[in-house]
């Protein structure tokens, strides 16, 4: 059922956590943010992921966040819960708690960071999480943040587990192509990099788990819709204008730039929690000009070349 629930989700937004200036969660800001996303082509929502600043959230805060979002969404789109840490026992206990909490199509579990496990260690970690509950698991492979990379061979080995239903892949397009070619049936493959969405979807990926959809969901939708209708020239033209905006959104550690843009647009995204800090004021102004207005001069002043965001 979870696979079918997520199959038509092309744009899954990795939701920010809005904070007050004192660092507490701003639950009052959630309804407007959610309605904004749903009005601009978000098909699903990931909670308590990297963009949500999950390393700074307690499990109790995450559960409060889950309840608040579920109350607003009311089943209109599938929800995914961030459930993984770098400690297997903690991940097992939390995935059981989230499964009992209910209301989620799947849980997202990150490759363990800091401990630097081997491929066999990664396999055993995810197998233990997937065995622990009935909540379907999506693996999050993001070597830019966790230092180690799960190989396609290990990923495909885990893809045979009946309770592991997909991956958020942030490695290379070559790896993505291999996974798409060799995956079993009913295994979802998402790119986790906004800038790669054009290429990933043309390779046959199922969708994108996105940060840029907070601010540029319409452009993302138009590009993916053009790909679906085999209008590659139109999709490529959108991609060329979209890339500078993605670069701007990752010119400082995420989610600082997207929060700056959301605050400018009138959504109370608030600050980041330490150790993340907001983008400097002048740079934030340039980021806003790029993301909101497509300002080419601001693009040149804000970012150089093409960034590969490790989010």
UniProtKB/Swiss-Prot annotation:
SUPFAM superfamilies: Aldolase. GO terms for molecular function: 4-hydroxy-tetrahydrodipicolinate synthase activity. The active site is at 140 (proton donor/acceptor), 168 (schiff-base intermediate with substrate). InterPro entries: Aldolase_TIM (IPR013785), DapA (IPR005263), DapA-like (IPR002220), Schiff_base-form_aldolases_AS (IPR020625). It holds the Pfam family DHDPS. Keywords: Amino-acid biosynthesis, Cytoplasm, Diaminopimelate biosynthesis, Lyase, Lysine biosynthesis, Schiff base. Pathway: Amino-acid biosynthesis; L-lysine biosynthesis via DAP pathway; (S)-tetrahydrodipicolinate from L-aspartate: step 3/4. The record marks 50, 114 as: Part of a proton relay during catalysis. Its main location: cytoplasm. The keyword Magnesium does not apply. HAMAP family: DapA. Belongs to the DapA family. Catalyzes the condensation of (S)-aspartate-beta-semialdehyde [(S)-ASA] and pyruvate to 4-hydroxy-tetrahydrodipicolinate (HTPA). This is 4-hydroxy-tetrahydrodipicolinate synthase. It comes from Streptococcus gordonii (strain Challis / ATCC 35105 / BCRC 15272 / CH1 / DL1 / V288). The lineage of its organism: Bacteria, Bacillati, Bacillota, Bacilli, Lactobacillales. The gene is dapA.
């Amino acid at each position: 059922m979870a696979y079918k629930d997520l199959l038509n989700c092309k744009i899954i937004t990795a939701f920010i956590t809005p904070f007050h200036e004192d660092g507490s969660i701003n639950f009052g800001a959630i309804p407007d943010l959610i309605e904004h996303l749903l009005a601009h082509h978000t098909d699903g929502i990931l909670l308590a992921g990297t963009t949500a600043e999950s390393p700074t959230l307690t499990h109790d805060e995450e559960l409060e966040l889950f309840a608040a979002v579920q109350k607003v969404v009311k089943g209109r789109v599938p929800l995914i819960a961030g459930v993984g840490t770098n400690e297997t026992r903690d991940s097992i206990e939390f995935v059981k708690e989230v499964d009992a909490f209910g209301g989620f199509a799947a849980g997202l579990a990150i490759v363990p960071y800091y401990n630097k496990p081997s491929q066999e260690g990664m396999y055993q970690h995810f197998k233990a999480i997937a065995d622990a509950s009935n909540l379907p698991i999506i693996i999050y492979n993001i070597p830019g943040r966790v230092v180690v990379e799960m190989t396609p061979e290990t990923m495909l080995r885990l893809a045979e587990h009946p309770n592991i239903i997909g991956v958020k892949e942030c490695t290379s397009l070559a790896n993505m192509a291999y996974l798409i070619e060799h995956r079993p049936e009913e295994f979802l493959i998402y790119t986790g990099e906004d800038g790669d969405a054009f290429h990933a979807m043309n390779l046959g990926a199922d969708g994108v788990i996105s940060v840029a959809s907070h601010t540029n969901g319409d452009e993302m939708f138009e590009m993916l819709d053009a790909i679906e209708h085999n209008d590659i020239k139109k999709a490529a033209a959108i991609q060329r204008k979209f890339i500078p905006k993605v670069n701007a959104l990752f010119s400082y550690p995420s989610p600082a730039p997207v929060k700056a843009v959301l605050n400018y647009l009138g959504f109370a995204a608030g600050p980041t929690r330490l150790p993340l800090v907001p983008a400097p004021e002048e740079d934030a102004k340039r980021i806003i000009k790029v993301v909101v207005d497509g300002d080419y001069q601001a693009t040149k002043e804000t970012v150089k070349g093409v960034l590969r965001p490790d989010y």
